[in-house]
C-alpha cells in the first residue's frame, strides 16, 4: 500500500503533469489528471496538494467559462489550504474566491472574504499578499463604481512597495479617469517615479489620459511610443532566441570535435 508521503509525491507529479497538458491546450487530459490526483490527495489527507489541484482545476474551468464549477473549486481550495495550515495560500485562495463571486454579482460575500484574507496578510507580514488583497478590494469597488473606496485600496496596495505596485498605479489612474478627475489624474502621473523598466506603463497612462480628455493628437503620440516600445521588445526577444540557438549549436559543435 502506498504511504502518505509517496501518495503526496504522486499527487504532486500528477499536478505538474496536468499543468503540462494545460500548456499544450489538452484540457480534457489535464482535467482527468487533476481529478485522479485530487482523489488520491484526499484519500491520503494530502491537503496542501489538494488545495493546489483545486486551484488549478478552477483555472481550467475558467478557460471554459464554467462559472459554477470554478466557484466550487475555489471554495474547495480555500478549505484544503486551511486544513493544511498553509495560511499564505489560504489567504490567496480567499482572495481568488472573492474575485470569483464578483462574476456572479455576489458582492455581499466578497468583502467578508477579503477582510479575512487581509487579516491573515497582516499576521504574516507579507507585503505582496497585502498588496494583492488591497488590489482585489480596489477592483471590486471599481466594479461597483465606488471610486473613493477603490482609490483608497489602490493607494494602500501602492504603499506596500510590492513588485507589482506599478500596476496598481495604472489601476488608480483608471479610477481617476472613470471618475472624471482628470486634473487629479495629471497630478498622479507627475508624482509617480519613472523607472526605465516600467516606462511603457507610464506612456500608456498618458495615452489613456489624453484620450479621455479628447486630446487625440497627444493620445496618438503616446500610443505610437507604446507601439515602438513593444516592437523593440519583440526585436530584443527574437535576437535573444537567435543567440541562444547559436550558443547551443556552438556547444554541440565543440562536443563533437572533442569526441
Question: What is each residue range found by the language model?
Answer:
Residues 12, 52-53, 92, 132, ...:
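Residue register of alpha-helical TPR repeats
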Amino acid at each position: 500500500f502506498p504511504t502518505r508521503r509517496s501518495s503526496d509525491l504522486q499527487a504532486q507529479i500528477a499536478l505538474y503533469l496536468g499543468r503540462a497538458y494545460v500548456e499544450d491546450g489538452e484540457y480534457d487530459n489535464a482535467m482527468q489528471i487533476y481529478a485522479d490526483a485530487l482523489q488520491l490527495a484526499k484519500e491520503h489527507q494530502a491537503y496542501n496538494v489538494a488545495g493546489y489541484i483545486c486551484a488549478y482545476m478552477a483555472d481550467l474551468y475558467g478557460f471554459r467559462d464554467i462559472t459554477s464549477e470554478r466557484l466550487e473549486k475555489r471554495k474547495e481550495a480555500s478549505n484544503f489550504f486551511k486544513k493544511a495550515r498553509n495560511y499564505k495560500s489560504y489567504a490567496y485562495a480567499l482572495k481568488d474566491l472573492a474575485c470569483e463571486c464578483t462574476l456572479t454579482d455576489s458582492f455581499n460575500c466578497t468583502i467578508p472574504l477579503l477582510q479575512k484574507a487581509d487579516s491573515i496578510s497582516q499576521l504574516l507580514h507579507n507585503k505582496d499578499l497585502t498588496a494583492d488583497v488591497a488590489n482585489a478590494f480596489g477592483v471590486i469597488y471599481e466594479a461597483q463604481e465606488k471610486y473613493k473606496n477603490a482609490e483608497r485600496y489602490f493607494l494602500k496596495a501602492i504603499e506596500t512597495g510590492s513588485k507589482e505596485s506599478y500596476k496598481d498605479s495604472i489601476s488608480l489612474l483608471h479610477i481617476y479617469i472613470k471618475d472624471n478627475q482628470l486634473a487629479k489624474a495629471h497630478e498622479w502621473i507627475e508624482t509617480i517615479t519613472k523607472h526605465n523598466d516600467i516606462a511603457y506603463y507610464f506612456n500608456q497612462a498618458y495615452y489613456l489620459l489624453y484620450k479621455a480628455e479628447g486630446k487625440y493628437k497627444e493620445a496618438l503620440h503616446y500610443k505610437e511610443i507604446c507601439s515602438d516600445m513593444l516592437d523593440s521588445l519583440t526585436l530584443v526577444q527574437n535576437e535573444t532566441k537567435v543567440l541562444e540557438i547559436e550558443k547551443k549549436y556552438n556547444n554541440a559543435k565543440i562536443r563533437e570535435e572533442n569526441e
